[in-house]
């Protein structure tokens, strides 16, 4: 590797909005994030299913038709 062209790597503290702190190496000093693996719904199991439905399902729901 060429000397003098690469950014300096330093210890970085990542702080989440929920209060969780992680330490890693990066070119930045501190990083603040809104979600992490401790508070994100996917990892905590509190996720909701977003079922928008297709065009046919919406039509059937709107006009009271059932699939029999």
From Swiss-Prot:
Record keywords, A-Z:
Metal-binding, Ribonucleoprotein, Ribosomal protein, RNA-binding, rRNA-binding, Zinc
Q: Which Pfam families match?
A: Ribosomal_L31 (PF01197)
> Tell me, what is an example of a GO biological process annotation in this record?
translation
This protein's superkingdom? Bacteria
Q: Which residues does the record give as Zn(2+) binding sites? A: 16, 18, 36, 39
Q: How is the cofactor bound?
A: Binds 1 zinc ion per subunit.
Query: What InterPro entries does the record tag this protein with?
Result: Ribosomal_bL28/bL31-like_sf, Ribosomal_bL31, Ribosomal_bL31_A, Ribosomal_bL31_sf
Q: Which cofactor does it need?
A: Zn(2+)
**What is one cellular component GO term in this UniProt entry?**
ribonucleoprotein complex
GO molecular function annotation: metal ion binding; rRNA binding; structural constituent of ribosome
> How the protein assembles, per its UniProt entry?
Part of the 50S ribosomal subunit.
Classification via NCBIfam families:
L31 (TIGR00105), PRK00019.1 (NF000612), PRK00528.1 (NF001809)
Family statement drawn from the similarity comment of this UniProt entry: Belongs to the bacterial ribosomal protein bL31 family. Type A subfamily.
Q: Which PANTHER family match?
A: 50S RIBOSOMAL PROTEIN L31, CHLOROPLASTIC, LARGE RIBOSOMAL SUBUNIT PROTEIN BL31C
What role is this protein assigned?
Binds the 23S rRNA.
What this protein is called in its record is: Large ribosomal subunit protein bL31
Which organism was this protein described from?
Halothermothrix orenii (strain H 168 / OCM 544 / DSM 9562)
């Amino acid at each position: 590797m060429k000397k003098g062209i690469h950014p300096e790597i330093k210890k970085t503290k990542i702080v989440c909005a929920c209060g969780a702190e992680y330490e890693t190496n990066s070119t930045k000093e501190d990083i603040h994030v809104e979600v992490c693996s401790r508070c994100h719904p996917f990892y905590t199991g509190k996720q909701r299913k977003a079922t928008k439905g297709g065009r046919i399902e919406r039509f059937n729901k709107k006009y009271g038709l059932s699939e029999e």
